[in-house]
Amino acid sequence: MFELCLRIKNWHREAGEDLHIGVLALQGDYAEHINMLQSNNADVSEIRLPSQLDDVDGLIIPGGESTTIVQLIDIYDFRTKLVEKASEGFPIWGTCAGMIVMARELTDHRPEPLNLMNIKVSRNAFGRQIDSFEEDLTIKGIDGKFPAVFIRAPIVVENDSSVDILCSIDKPSGPVAVQQGKLLATSFHPELTNDSRMHEYFLSIVKM
């Protein structure tokens, strides 16, 4: 696992060159991810049909309303395709609700996640929208502190040895950034900051 956790150095606007990244555009804050990727010179497509996944090098599942996103994934027949792509080593990054979607299991057993990563997740672990906050985090693979925005965020409550913990916090206690091969999940919203280093980190995974 450690070989995938690269130190991101000298990655700026060139990070996304020669890469075509998809952002699942069924619901949620996909536009903010698109803007961040484009600032790193990546070619970006809004993904609305499963067949489009074959045309991109990696996928971001954005934050939003997890139940709605899963319902739309099933309505548009994404589930089987996403599971197949993940098993083939296709890079996927889920942020906030995207982490919930990628989980093996949820503490409240709804909605039914895709079981892409060996993690059990608690939804809304940090409270309601009014309890949103920002915290500077130390994240494995990222130089310096990262300003993480938490909005009704989930947290990982169980994981197996195949999952690399990139960052944990104390209250509530648990991982908020995890990686399993080329699958990445974060509880927080990097796309809502002016800091592109988490996106650069994902682009480095895609380039592996």
Regions found by a protein language model. Give the residues of each.
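Redox-cofactor binding/interface segments in oxidoreductases and associated redox assembly factors
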Residues: I61, G94, T186
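N-terminal beta1-alpha1 cap of cysteine-dependent amidohydrolase-like domains
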Residues: M1-I75, T80-K85, S196-E200, S204-M208
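Cysteine-nucleophile active-site neighborhood
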Residues: S66-T138
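Flexible, glycine-rich phosphate/dinucleotide-binding loops
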Residues: Y30, L53, V101, D108, ...
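Short coil/turn connectors at secondary-structure junctions
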Residues: D18, V56, E88-F90, P111-E112, ...
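Cofactor-binding loop segments of dinucleotide-utilizing enzymes, especially the Rossmann-like FAD-
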Residues: L26, A97, F188
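Amide-donor transfer/coupling interface in amidating biosynthetic enzymes
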Residues: F2-A15, R123-M208
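Hydrophobic anchor at the start of a short beta-strand
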Residues: V44-S45, I92, L183
